[in-house]
Amino acid sequence: RMAIDAGADVVLGSGPHVTRAVDLYKNRFIAYSLGNFCTYGMFNLDGPKGVAPLLALNINEKGEFISAKVTSIFQQDNEHLVIDPSGKAFQLLKQLTQSDIPEAALQFSEDGIITKKPLKN
């Protein structure tokens, strides 16, 4: 959030080698960690360490979040990237966001799209 306060429009984090929650702050998109997208043999890629979301972000001219299309990826045999038709990375993003940041103003569709929740009147 400090990066957005400093002027960033989007924050894409990495570091813990696992996918983490996503958030919306001041209408800006934050992905706290995108996991292991493509790495080499020394890393254990079992379970959640082996899946990663590939994001196609849609933001407006002001940098405000509109939507994200998530393609779930896994690394096969520590070499090849493969699209995961079961959507494990997307489901993990959804689950972690709903449990870790329940106030996040994001909604997750069944087809891998993240959008802003409608404003309540």
State where each predicted segment sits.
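A short C-terminal boundary segment appended to hydrolase-like catalytic domains
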Residues: D46-N121
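Conserved beta-sheet core of the metallophosphoesterase superfamily
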Residues: R1-P53
